[in-house]
Regions:
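Beta-strand-rich modules
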Residues: 2-20
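Surface-exposed coil/turn segments at beta-strand junctions on protein surfaces, enriched
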Residues: 3-7, 185, 289
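Extracellular fibronectin type III
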Residues: 17-39
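Low-complexity, Pro/Ser/Thr- and charge-rich linker/hinge segments at domain boundaries
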Residues: 31-53
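Short, solvent-exposed loop/turn elements at domain surfaces
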Residues: 51-57, 141, 200, 281-283, ...
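Helical hinge/lid and interdomain linker segments adjacent to catalytic or ligand-binding clefts
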Residues: 81-208
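A glycine-rich, often tryptophan-bearing local segment used as a flexible ligand/cofactor-contacting loop or short
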Residues: 165-259, 312
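Catalytic beta-strand/loop cores that center a nucleophilic Ser/Cys/Thr
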Residues: 222-306
């Protein structure tokens, strides 16, 4: 057992070594013990974002067009990308090379040449954990497979934070759905955030049932925001407030977001807490019944600044921990 010093976030990754060299490292898991030492304030952070992918592409034989659709999905580079120079604008296969200034099919803008573009850095438990530590919470972390396969037992943790990032189908595997369903049935609390949770689940009956019946939400829009701005809105939870911004353009710090989910409550005990101001579509919902959930249609780790992440995380953890003055009367 590795020693954990109180008040310091410890992060670990593992690689295999033999005579042939060294393997790619594992994802990074982190752990933190708060100086406050409150046992009921330890969060289990689960990294469910392990996707690596190229950008969305298309091919049309009817009109001889083909290329990459960065506006739909830029993909997810491994750690970072140093080869991307800009979005494609020439899709005609018939367009031939004429000069370095007119490159023909596949020609692209050059506004990102020489820049490092962030991809999946596999360290998001650390980023989420930083915000929790600022609020006085301890945390441990694991991969989604460890939780789904029973290596990690969730029952001893009052809160689970499931990171989904830009994960695609399946966003939450059926086995993990069963694990979370069982955990919540015992009165647990779940925070889940990501770009495709609702949109990718809507076309699959089992996934949709989980979203509606367990998370108590439903899809409002697949492309809910272009500006990357989120505002709080009127709700029974006035302490969840403020304005937040997430990254929508390629940058060296965090993967960029092309589209986010718009969400709606699917239960009378669920409420919208955040909206995208450009169209007033819901960006986040909470449910308070026999268990509590908070579902965000955008990735928490993609928020622009640590202060934004700290502020939003503090509000969400407060929602999970406080006892409401007016007890909800459950209908059996």
């Amino acid at each position: 057992i590795l020693p954990i010093e109180t008040g310091i976030i410890h992060s670990y990754k593992v690689a295999a070594v033999n005579k042939g060299g060294i393997s790619f490292p594992s994802e990074i898991v982190s752990v933190y013990r708060s100086p406050k030492g409150e046992k009921d304030k330890t969060v289990l952070i689960v990294n469910g974002f392990d996707r690596i992918s190229g950008p969305a592409s298309f091919e049309s034989t009817a009109d001889s067009l083909a290329g990459f659709l960065y506006a739909v999905d830029r993909g997810v580079p491994y750690l970072n990308d140093i080869a991307f120079i800009g979005d494609q604008f020439e899709f005609r296969r018939s367009a031939t090379w004429n000069s370095n200034d007119n490159n023909g099919h596949g020609d692209s803008y050059n506004n990102y040449a020489g820049q490092v573009i962030a991809g999946n850095t596999f360290d998001y438990p650390f980023i989420h954990g930083q915000a929790m530590a600022e609020t006085g919470y301890s945390f441990v972390s694991c991969s989604h497979k460890s939780l789904a396969e029973g290596v990690v037992k969730p029952d001893t943790y009052p809160i689970i934070d499931l990171i989904l990032g830009k994960q695609r189908q399946p966003v939450i595997t059926p086995v993990l759905q069963d694990t979370l369903r069982s955990y919540l049935a015992q009165g647990g609390n779940l925070l889940v955030s990501g770009t495709n949770l609702f949109s990718d689940s809507w076309g699959n009956a089992q996934d949709r049932t989980f979203v509606e019946e367990v998370l108590k939400g439903k899809l409002a829009s697949r492309n809910a925001s272009k500006e990357g701005i989120v505002n709080s809105c009127a709700s029974p939870y006035g302490y969840i407030n403020g304005r937040y911004t997430f990254r929508t353009r390629p940058n060296p710090i965090c993967y960029s977001i092309e589209s986010v989910d718009g969400v709606l409550p699917a239960d009378k005990l669920a409420h919208t807490i955040l909206r995208y101001p450009e169209n007033n579509i819901g960006a986040g919902i909470v449910y308070e019944g026999k268990y509590r959930t908070c579902s965000l249609g955008f990735p928490f780790e993609a928020l622009q600044t640590p202060s934004e992440r700290n502020r939003l995380m503090e509000s969400i953890l407060r929602f999970f921990s406080i006892q409401q003055q007016n007890k909800i009367q459950y209908i059996q």
